[in-house]
């Protein structure tokens, strides 16, 4: 093959439309937001993620101004702002790589269910001697292995949902790299356990091939077609006479892609050529194809027999005379040596360290006990590609350095990393530094303090990552993820109950509740963890929200449940005041149903008693009692039952807990205009005496609240005296007259 021929197998970079000015050329159907996601730095070529979704705070060619930003406790509360004169705008800031999608929520929930269902198997116990303990360890390993498989399935489903979404290319590749690391981890530690090695060999081989071949997708179809197109441009040579064909064939074999390798041999027309040219070579290749078809994945003993046949075939071909070119003979001999597990040839035809590692496990000695040796030889031949985030973690996994993979995985996806740490700890791959063999009396003060800290280093890496992830979920502002966060903290294998209780108490008031179901969930957590003070805080928050929505009754009810009795009393009196100012019942069917003793009128809204009992508390009944009396007063007034109406009004006026300024309100709105100005409405001696006594003891012209309230009253009713002092004089005159009427 000439140099020109070999160049055809290389990429022609001149044919690619690389970005010259750092701006990605996207199709016109992309939205502005998606286009922003693909802008690149003109110097480094790195993808630029804008701070804000829409307009940028500082124009590209505008004046230089200081830009600052502040992170909020929730992901959507981050703000950027310019500290310059006359700049008051706030810009919502989106943190890059923060996933708030529905697909992510479903993924997190799925992983949490796996974690929860592990039960006692979340904790690894060192196996001891004995039949019972041996069976327990076997069952524990089987449960944890199934959980690992379920985690992989959840991640694959998540990747499938993200794959075709616009603007999420980076997220897709990060998840794929996480999946590659998990596939390697499962292959090395979650399939072959003790006595189950032989029966799980087939599953191990399948997992090994899945890890290797999904990691990079090589060789791809384009490369294969490129190899087979060489024959069209190489004069006098067939495709199977080129080194590229045999490199491809051996690569497929090393990766365990045996059906594809057989397909390449058949497509190359090698067998028809050998059939007409060299019977020995034809038999060797034909037998090798049959051996590849019968590769034993399920049995080590069968593998030894299979390999023995391959070695005999290779030796027979090497010692036989052939009628083909020396170059083609060398290619076929190398092919047979690769299948036979020859170390030198496996390393020669491997393009990466993981291809040779896979080749050793498939064709040399399929034992994980030799994995460290295989890895060392593979790395000496092909170093780790540091541009792939997954390669070094896979090397660390094979080397047994499980702790080292967690920071890399966390940089790819914190959720996957946290649950990976959990499953590794359950398997016993990473241990809890804090020894669990001490009795509670053996702990020092320092130990006790660390037990009370869920983030103590002594709790282990898995505990730290799970608890950190729980806090991260709370910061996303997605209420669907809060049960997962609380569940992670509650199920933590480390930390005391009081430590978990303290953390939950700190988090729960920040829950972004919307519906009644959300509130019931919060309160159920308070009951489960015995958090009465947090329940009161929740009721207070509810009360303030209801107050903002002008739902006074429910607001008062929540304040009452929170023990905020001063607020209950204050807002109950405000209802009383509002009703007095209007001179009639408030237009609130719930309030009127609470205070009504009579059957509802035809136009009243009927509210079932059980609902009222749920709303009304004992403190509410007490604080709303003045409004209830006032409501009955309105009913008697409307029926013109003046005697009974006056009796109720006097009950309010002489009520010992009536705020001072409300005396002016009752007198100015009801007593003076209805009973004192009308000479036809008689008052008995006791009633007049009661009013006089209250006026003399409680009336205060200098009281600011009373003065302000009276000014508000006379703005609506010009017939009243212009001042409280004048009103007081008129009151005394009218009371004297009423007293005279009573004697006459």
From Swiss-Prot:
Membrane topology: Peripheral membrane protein
GO molecular function annotation: structural constituent of nuclear pore
UniProt-listed GO biological process terms: mRNA export from nucleus; nuclear pore localization; nucleocytoplasmic transport; positive regulation of DNA-templated transcription; protein import into nucleus; ribosomal large subunit export from nucleus
Assigned GO CC terms: nuclear envelope; nuclear membrane; nuclear pore; nuclear pore outer ring
Cellular localization per UniProt: Nucleus, Nuclear pore complex; Nucleus membrane
Gene3D superfamilies the UniProt entry points to: 2.20.25.500
Pfam family of the protein (one): Nucleopor_Nup85
Keywords: Membrane, mRNA transport, Nuclear pore complex, Nucleus, Protein transport, Translocation, Transport
Primary location class: nucleus
Function, in words: Functions as a component of the nuclear pore complex (NPC). NPC components, collectively referred to as nucleoporins (NUPs), can play the role of both NPC structural components and of docking or interaction partners for transiently associated nuclear transport factors. NUP85 is involved in nuclear poly(A)+ RNA and pre-ribosome export, in GSP1 nuclear import, in NPC assembly and distribution, as well as in nuclear envelope organization.
Note: Present with 7920 molecules/cell in log phase SD medium.
Family note: Belongs to the nucleoporin Nup85 family.
Quaternary structure and partners: Component of the nuclear pore complex (NPC). NPC constitutes the exclusive means of nucleocytoplasmic transport. NPCs allow the passive diffusion of ions and small molecules and the active, nuclear transport receptor-mediated bidirectional transport of macromolecules such as proteins, RNAs, ribonucleoparticles (RNPs), and ribosomal subunits across the nuclear envelope. Due to its 8-fold rotational symmetry, all subunits are present with 8 copies or multiples thereof.
The protein's name in its UniProt record: Nucleoporin NUP85
Organism encoding this protein: Saccharomyces cerevisiae (strain ATCC 204508 / S288c) (Baker's yeast)
Source organism phylogeny: Eukaryota, Fungi, Dikarya, Ascomycota, Saccharomycotina
């Amino acid at each position: 093959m000439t140099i020109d021929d070999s160049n055809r197998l290389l990429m022609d970079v001149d044919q690619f439309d690389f970005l010259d000015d750092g701006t990605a050329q996207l199709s016109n159907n992309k939205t502005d937001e998606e286009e922003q996601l693909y802008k690149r730095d003109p110097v480094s070529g790195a993808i630029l993620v804008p701070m804000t979704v829409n307009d940028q705070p500082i124009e590209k060619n505008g004046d230089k101004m200081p830009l600052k930003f502040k992170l909020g406790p929730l992901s959507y509360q981050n703000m950027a702002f310019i500290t310059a004169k006359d700049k008051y705008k706030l810009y919502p800031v989106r943190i890059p790589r923060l996933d708030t999608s529905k697909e992510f929520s479903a993924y997190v929930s799925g992983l949490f269910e796996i974690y929860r269902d592990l039960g006692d198997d979340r904790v690894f116990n060192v196996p001891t001697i004995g039949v019972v303990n041996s069976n327990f360890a076997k069952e524990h390993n089987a449960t944890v292995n199934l959980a690992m498989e379920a985690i992989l399935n959840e991640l694959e489903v998540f990747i499938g949902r993200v794959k075709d979404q616009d603007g999420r290319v980076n997220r897709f590749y990060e998840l794929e790299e996480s999946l590659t690391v998990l596939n390697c981890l499962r292959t090395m530690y979650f399939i072959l356990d003790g006595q189950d090695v032989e029966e799980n060999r087939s599953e191990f081989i399948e997992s090994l091939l899945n890890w290797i071949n999904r990691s990079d997708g090589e060789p791809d179809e384009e490369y294969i077609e490129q190899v087979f197109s060489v024959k069209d441009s190489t004069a006098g040579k067939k495709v199977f006479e080129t080194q590229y064909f045999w490199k491809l064939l051996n690569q497929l074999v090393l990766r365990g892609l045996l059906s594809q390798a057989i397909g390449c041999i058949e497509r190359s027309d090698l067998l028809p050529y050998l059939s007409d040219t060299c019977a020995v070579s034809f038999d060797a290749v034909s037998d090798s194809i049959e051996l590849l078809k019968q590769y034993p994945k399920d049995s080590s003993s069968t593998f030894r027999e299979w390999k023995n046949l391959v070695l005999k075939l290779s030796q027979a071909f090497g010692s036989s005379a052939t009628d083909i070119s020396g170059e083609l003979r060398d290619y076929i001999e190398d092919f047979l040596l690769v299948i036979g597990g020859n170390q030198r040839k496996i390393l020669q035809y491997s393009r990466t360290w993981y291809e040779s590692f896979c080749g050793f496990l498939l064709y040399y000695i399929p034992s994980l006990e030799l994995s460290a040796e295989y890895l060392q030889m593979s790395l000496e031949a092909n170093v780790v590609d540091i541009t792939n985030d997954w390669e070094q973690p896979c090397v660390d996994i094979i080397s047994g350095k499980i702790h080292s993979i967690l920071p890399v995985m966390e940089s790819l996806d914190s959720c996957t990393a946290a649950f990976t740490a959990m499953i590794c700890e359950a398997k016993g791959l990473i241990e809890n530094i804090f020894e669990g063999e001490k009795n509670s009396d053996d702990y020092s003060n320092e130990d006790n303090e660390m037990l009370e800290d869920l983030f103590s280093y002594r709790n282990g890496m898995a505990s730290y990552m799970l608890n950190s992830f729980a806090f991260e979920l709370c910061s996303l502002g997605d209420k669907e993820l809060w049960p997962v966060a609380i569940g992670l903290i509650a199920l933590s294998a480390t930390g005391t109950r009081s430590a978990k209780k303290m953390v939950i108490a700190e988090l729960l008031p920040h829950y972004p509740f919307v519906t009644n179901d959300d509130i019931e969930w919060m309160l159920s957590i308070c009951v489960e963890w015995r958090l009465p003070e947090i329940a009161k805080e929740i009721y207070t928050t509810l009360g303030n929200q209801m107050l903002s929505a002008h739902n006074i009754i429910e607001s008062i009810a929540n304040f009452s449940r929170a023990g905020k009795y001063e607020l209950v009393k204050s807002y109950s009196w405000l209802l009383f005041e509002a009703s007095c100012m209007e001179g009639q019942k408030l237009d609130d069917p719930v309030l009127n149903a609470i205070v009504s003793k009579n059957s509802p009128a035809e136009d009243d809204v009927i509210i079932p008693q059980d609902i009222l009992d749920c709303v009304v508390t004992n403190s509410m009944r007490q604080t709303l009692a003045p409004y209830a009396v006032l409501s009955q007063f309105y009913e008697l007034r409307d029926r013109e039952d003046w005697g009974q109406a006056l009796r109720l009004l006097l009950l309010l006026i002489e009520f010992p807990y009536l705020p001072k300024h409300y005396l002016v309100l009752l007198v100015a709105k009801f007593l003076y205009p209805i009973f004192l100005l009308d000479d036809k409405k008689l008052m008995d001696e006791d009633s007049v005496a009661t009013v006089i006594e209250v006026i003399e003891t409680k009336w205060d012209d200098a009281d600011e609240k009373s003065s302000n309230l009276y000014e508000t009253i006379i703005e609506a009713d010009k017939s009243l005296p212009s001042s409280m002092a004048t009103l007081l004089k008129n009151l005394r005159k009218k009371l004297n007259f009423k007293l005279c009427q009573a004697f006459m």
